[in-house]
UniProtKB/Swiss-Prot annotation:
InterPro entries, per the entry: Ribosomal_uS8, Ribosomal_uS8_CS, Ribosomal_uS8_sf
Binding partners and assembly: Component of the small ribosomal subunit (SSU). Mature N.crassa ribosomes consist of a small (40S) and a large (60S) subunit. The 40S small subunit contains 1 molecule of ribosomal RNA (18S rRNA) and at least 32 different proteins. The large 60S subunit contains 3 rRNA molecules (26S, 5.8S and 5S rRNA) and at least 42 different proteins.
GO MF: structural constituent of ribosome
Location of the protein in the cell: Cytoplasm
Superkingdom of the source species: Eukaryota
A GO cellular component annotation in the UniProt record: cytosolic small ribosomal subunit
Pfam families given in the database record: Ribosomal_S8
Role of this protein: Component of the ribosome, a large ribonucleoprotein complex responsible for the synthesis of proteins in the cell. The small ribosomal subunit (SSU) binds messenger RNAs (mRNAs) and translates the encoded message by selecting cognate aminoacyl-transfer RNA (tRNA) molecules. The large subunit (LSU) contains the ribosomal catalytic site termed the peptidyl transferase center (PTC), which catalyzes the formation of peptide bonds, thereby polymerizing the amino acids delivered by tRNAs into a polypeptide chain.
Organism: Neurospora crassa (strain ATCC 24698 / 74-OR23-1A / CBS 708.71 / DSM 1257 / FGSC 987)
Major site of localization recorded for this protein: cytoplasm
GO biological process, one term: translation
Name of this protein: Small ribosomal subunit protein uS8
Keywords: Cytoplasm, Ribonucleoprotein, Ribosomal protein
Length: 130
């Protein structure tokens, strides 16, 4: 299997487990970007608790699913997005207004598009979920 990106593999595992009706999913390898992405998802209630398991290698993450996720994905390549262009990407990626989130990596950290708009920061789009 060709590994495209660690974040892509993690979100693909979550998507597949949600479609299969699983209650939890094991993600490996672990990375800081995946953990921050999961924290944003957890903050909005799309996943339950998650814990990082240190296996003295690349690490694992066990995520509790609550069945609320419809789809999550990665945007590759990571496009630079100005604050004025952000609405165009939100319309393109999400199915409806007030439904789902676009995740950006900014100088202030990894956050959703609403928080980026509030803090008035822009950056690169890394993914979305709804």
């Amino acid at each position: 299997m060709v590994r495209t990106s660690v974040l892509h593999d993690a979100l693909n595992s979550i998507n597949n487990a949600e479609k299969a009706g699983k209650r939890q999913v094991l993600i490996r390898p672990s990375s800081k970007v995946i953990i921050k992405f999961l924290q944003v998802m957890q903050k909005h209630g799309y996943i339950g608790e998650f814990e990082e398991v240190d296996d003295h290698r690349s690490g694992k993450i066990v995520v509790q699913l609550n069945g609320r996720m419809n789809k999550c994905g990665v945007i590759s390549p990571r496009y630079n997005v100005r604050l004025a262009e952000l609405e165009k990407w939100v319309v393109k990626l999400l199915p409806a207004r007030q439904f789902g989130y676009v995740i950006l990596t900014t100088s202030a950290g990894i956050m959703d598009h609403e928080e980026a708009r509030r803090k008035h920061v822009s950056g690169k789009i890394i993914g979305f979920f709804y």
